[in-house]
């Protein structure tokens, strides 16, 4: 049994598009590579064949993973997200208590939608886990691989 995942509509559509490309494009390309490698004869020492089979295995595993995620996904409507506490899909403005005048903003999302370059962090990350359920004014102390982080929650909102 799979864990339910929570996605935005955009996140769901991105995963669906990736699945479509894997099934209708990548899978066919890999089968063509396998057929081409087979045409070269002896498969026992055929690195091209082995590489194509490995790519096929990875492609099929990703297809199965995406099908599972999409079948268990719950699409969240940002308009229905409360901002009294930090929840998935809320954005938080944090004051770094270790660096003067540093304010950081994160949006908490599922692991599938996390993108630190865009300020989207997973609710399963150390920072995400520490923020869930907190309210404005709470001070949060987080242990991460690089040490300790200390923040104060300044604002909770939905983008």
Curated annotation (Swiss-Prot):
Q: Which Gene3D superfamilies match?
A: Transcription elongation factor, GreA/GreB, C-terminal domain, Transcription elongation factor, GreA/GreB, N-terminal domain
For this chain's UniProt record, which GO biological process terms are given? DNA-templated transcription elongation; regulation of DNA-templated transcription elongation
Q: Which InterPro entries match?
A: GreA/GreB_C_sf, TF_GreA/GreB_CS, Tscrpt_elong_fac_GreA, Tscrpt_elong_fac_GreA/B, Tscrpt_elong_fac_GreA/B_C, Tscrpt_elong_fac_GreA/B_fam, Tscrpt_elong_fac_GreA/B_N, Tscrpt_elong_fac_GreA/B_N_sf
The membrane-spanning stretches of this chain are none
Asked whether the UniProt record includes Transcription regulation among its keywords, one would answer yes
Matches recorded under Pfam families: GreA_GreB, GreA_GreB_N
Checking PROSITE patterns in the record gives: GREAB_1 (PS00829), GREAB_2 (PS00830)
What stretch or stretches form a coiled coil here? 44-75
Q: Which family does it belong to?
A: Belongs to the GreA/GreB family.
Known role: Necessary for efficient RNA polymerase transcription elongation past template-encoded arresting sites. The arresting sites in DNA have the property of trapping a certain fraction of elongating RNA polymerases that pass through, resulting in locked ternary complexes. Cleavage of the nascent transcript by cleavage factors such as GreA or GreB allows the resumption of elongation from the new 3'terminus. GreA releases sequences of 2 to 3 nucleotides.
Q: What is this protein called?
A: Transcription elongation factor GreA
Q: Which organism is it from?
A: Chlorobium limicola (strain DSM 245 / NBRC 103803 / 6330)
- Write the gene name: greA
């Amino acid at each position: 049994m799979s864990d339910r995942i929570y996605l935005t509509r955009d996140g769901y559509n991105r995963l669906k598009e990736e699945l479509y490309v894997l099934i209708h494009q990548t899978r066919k390309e890999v089968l063509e590579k396998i057929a081409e490698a087979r045409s070269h004869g002896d498969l026992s020492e055929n690195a091209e064949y082995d590489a194509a089979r490995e790519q096929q295995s990875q492609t099929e595993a990703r297809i199965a993973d995406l099908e599972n995620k999409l079948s268990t996904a719950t699409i969240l409507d940002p308009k229905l997200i409360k901002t009294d506490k930090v929840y998935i899909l809320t954005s938080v403005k944090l004051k770094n208590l270790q660096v003067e005048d540093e304010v950081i903003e994160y949006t908490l999302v599922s692991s599938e939608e996390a993108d630190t370059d865009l300020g989207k962090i997973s609710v399963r990350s150390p920072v995400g886990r520490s923020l869930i359920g907190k309210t404005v004014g709470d001070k949060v102390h987080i242990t991460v691989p690089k040490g300790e982080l200390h923040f104060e929650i300044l604002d909770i909102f939905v983008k």
